[in-house]
């Protein structure tokens, strides 16, 4: 059975004081919660501090992005080897903010995916459609294209022990969210699409939902059979709200 993952993407938020306070509160809030994996992805400059703050807890460390080069004259980049060196486990790639603001292509994201897998890091591949694409009925087409970039470059086996996060772009940071039924339909499509190449891999791949997940809608989302946790934005900056989401994922798994 798949183990849900709830991961907090802190985006461009944080300070030394905030990292300390938030992790301390989060450790207290989720102490004793089982049945759900938990990770946080702070800004890169706070990874080492976060590693120290989560020490001895069940919280795993994530990163918000990675470069594809391991070393060299690449000013401003962070290599996946560096992330591994500070005990990062999960690495978010393909987030819509990277695709939009940094013009990252499906092929470039597939390159990142491959490098992470080679180093034993877990890619968290973000996919999803814009509001215009959603209204035009192109959700499945867009998600298939983004998944196919990985399948074509690396094969279905690359999704073994990987994570996919379906994040409809129109729901990120907007307060809007797909209904549980809408999200489930897309998650099932993603799983079925991978299953065309490898049913066993498709069955075990974790597919998170992202896009204005909060403490109010998490439980209903997680009740759906193909939703395996969440990639959480704004709500991950509040320990109590994030903890409610973690607990909802754990409770939903116990019922499945």
From Swiss-Prot:
Organism: Proteus mirabilis (strain HI4320)
Family annotation (CDD domains): TIM (cd00311)
Gene3D superfamilies with a match to the protein in the record: Aldolase class I
Phylogenetic lineage: Bacteria, Pseudomonadati, Pseudomonadota, Gammaproteobacteria, Enterobacterales
Protein name: Triosephosphate isomerase
PANTHER family hit by this protein: TRIOSEPHOSPHATE ISOMERASE
Assembly behavior: Homodimer.
Gene: tpiA
InterPro entries linked: Aldolase_TIM, TIM_sf, TrioseP_Isoase_bac/euk, Triosephosphate_isomerase, Triosephosphate_isomerase_AS
Family: Belongs to the triosephosphate isomerase family.
Active-site residues per Swiss-Prot or TrEMBL entry: 95, 167
């Amino acid at each position: 059975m798949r183990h849900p993952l709830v991961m907090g993407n802190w985006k461009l938020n944080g300070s030394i004081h905030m990292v300390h306070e938030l992790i301390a509160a989060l450790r207290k809030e989720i102490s004793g919660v089982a049945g759900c994996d938990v990770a946080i992805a702070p800004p890169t400059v706070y990874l080492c501090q976060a590693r120290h703050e989560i020490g001895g807890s069940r919280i795993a460390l994530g990163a918000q992005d990675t470069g594809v080069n391991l070393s060299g004259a690449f000013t401003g980049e962070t290599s996946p080897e560096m992330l591994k060196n500070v005990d990062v486990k999960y690495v978010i790639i393909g987030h819509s903010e990277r695709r939009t603001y940094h013009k990252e292509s499906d092929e470039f994201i597939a390159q990142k995916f491959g490098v992470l897998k080679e180093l034993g890091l877990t890619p968290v591949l973000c996919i999803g459609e814009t509001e215009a694409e959603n209204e035009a009925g192109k959700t499945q087409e867009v998600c298939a294209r983004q998944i196919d970039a990985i399948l074509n470059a690396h094969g279905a086996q690359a999704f073994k022990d990987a994570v996919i996060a379906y994040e409809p772009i129109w729901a990120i940071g907007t307060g809007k969210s797909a209904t549980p039924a809408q999200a489930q339909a897309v998650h099932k499509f993603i799983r079925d699409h991978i299953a065309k190449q490898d049913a066993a891999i498709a069955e075990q791949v974790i597919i998170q939902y992202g896009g204005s997940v909060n403490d109010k809608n998490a439980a209903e989302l997680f009740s759906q059979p193909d939703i395996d946790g969440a990639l959480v934005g704004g709500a991950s900056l509040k320990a109590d709200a994030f903890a409610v989401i973690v607990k909802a994922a754990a409770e939903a798994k116990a019922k499945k």
